[in-house]
Amino acid sequence: MTSFSLTFTSPLLPSSSTKPKRSVLVAAAQTTAPAESTASVDADRLEPRVELKDGFFILKEKFRKGINPQEKVKIEREPMKLFMENGIEELAKKSMEELDSEKSSKDDIDVRLKWLGLFHRRKHQYGKFMMRLKLPNGVTTSAQTRYLASVIRKYGEDGCADVTTRQNWQIRGVVLPDVPEILKGLASVGLTSLQSGMDNVRNPVGNPIAGIDPEEIVDTRPYTNLLSQFITANSQGNPDFTNLPRKWNVCVVGTHDLYEHPHINDLAYMPANKDGRFGFNLLVGGFFSPKRCEEAIPLDAWVPADDVLPLCKAVLEAYRDLGTRGNRQKTRMMWLIDELGVEGFRTEVEKRMPNGKLERGSSEDLVNKQWERRDYFGVNPQKQEGLSFVGLHVPVGRLQADDMDELARLADTYGSGELRLTVEQNIIIPNVETSKTEALLQEPFLKNRFSPEPSILMKGLVACTGSQFCGQAIIETKLRALKVTEEVERLVSVPRPIRMHWTGCPNTCGQVQVADIGFMGCLTRGEEGKPVEGADVYVGGRIGSDSHIGEIYKKGVRVTELVPLVAEILIKEFGAVPREREENED
């Protein structure tokens, strides 16, 4: 079993003399478990389903009946051995035809390489891979950005990068023979792609303006860095958590704005005081899937800041040990919570804490429920006197190599050589001397696509990869999202920012359920009765302290008919005014 530990100093308690001055206490009901929190569970059900063997956790023989195909692949060969025992070196020497000729190596390509952050695009880009990184809190450097640009540049039209909805980079066009050198290159600039896909902990999310935010509750960077280092054992691979039943998301909240979207994470740390100590209340179980979407619920538990890591470890161990491994649509952590009951799940977590104890939730939440979410675009003052951060719009999160090089240059020229990625697929340049902001705004790069002042509908636009690169996507998303939004903006004037999210399939990587208006790709019938690209339209998703998952507004809308429908929704639900009427009134 991996031996790994880190310690750090807890932040100062927020007090009457420290920021944020606008924080208020919220009701205790938000941090205590609901009444229906217990379930009748047979003692045999609490037997761990995995065991440690040869340094890795594997599913016990007695629990293998009815398991899903992915679990069988994991049993046949531990995926992390491709990295930890240099299996990737051997794979990289073979042609795709050779690899496809044997089941074991074909499973390596299509399944196990995801543990190294490599996703084969068999359907649309045979032999090409998407590589997902680990980028805790979305913080990256100009050197890292330049290196990634150098990687994708060599792949021509197939090479590009995306900012993801978890503050992360994904690069495209990668071919297998290049992977060993790319992994070395990533390590040389302080990056890793390990344990970023499949049944692993995904990128830890935090406040994108952590440490520079004048109104932050706590700087989330020490916590997200700690979590990422623990999960990957300092980028060496942590076999304790490479065999989860399904993917698992975590975030640390540091702001009243809830940029971190805690309600859709498996584990969310919510800042709270208790008896004069700073720490976190815990939300658990939030997730999206094709068959079910759930908001995270209170665990009725609080941990001091120093126990962020032990708590994460305990939750992961409970999920790893007890989670079901049958139908993949029923293996996310909330299904286990349903089965055990909130209190039963809490007990299992408590058992796995270092001292076997877990404090009850605190009523002293530090997140202000009445807070109006701030916009981070444009020039904004930092908590550090004389410095500002500048938020830039990245249309649907897509960048080319030249774009990344230019961002790196701007970060070096005007800032501190650092960039911040956001869950809305945008980028922030921090630590800009306020005296230099005007010169930055005059840069040609900011005059076109990467504007610090995007239009009111563009600024809230998010889109997944879509069918251009993803084999699971039913429709093209990124270009269509831009086109539909441009056409809608010509039809109506909107009084406030509206968040519109696009996802190409029911896996909802584009997180349509949290959007004001969401579009989920589907096939529908055309005028001649033949299948055509369409979208199920969602309305009513909310983020922030009154977070809520949106609901279906209309199913199976042809993509060619979306523009008038969106304009209609904006007028009926969001106070938009037709452009023609606005011009007449003017």
Swiss-Prot record:
GO terms for cellular component: apoplast; chloroplast; chloroplast stroma; mitochondrion. It catalyses: 6 oxidized [2Fe-2S]-[ferredoxin] + NH4(+) + 2 H2O = nitrite + 6 reduced [2Fe-2S]-[ferredoxin] + 8 H(+). Binds 1 siroheme per subunit. Binds 1 [4Fe-4S] cluster per subunit. The keyword Lipid metabolism does not apply. GO terms for biological process: nitrate assimilation; response to nitrate. Residues 1-25 form a transit peptide. Its cofactor is siroheme; [4Fe-4S] cluster. Residues 1-20 are annotated as: Disordered. One of its GO terms (molecular function) is ferredoxin-nitrite reductase activity. There is a cross-link at K103 (Glycyl lysine isopeptide (Lys-Gly) (interchain with G-Cter in ubiquitin)). NCBIfam families: PRK09566.1. Belongs to the nitrite and sulfite reductase 4Fe-4S domain family. Monomer. This is Ferredoxin--nitrite reductase, chloroplastic. It comes from Arabidopsis thaliana (Mouse-ear cress).
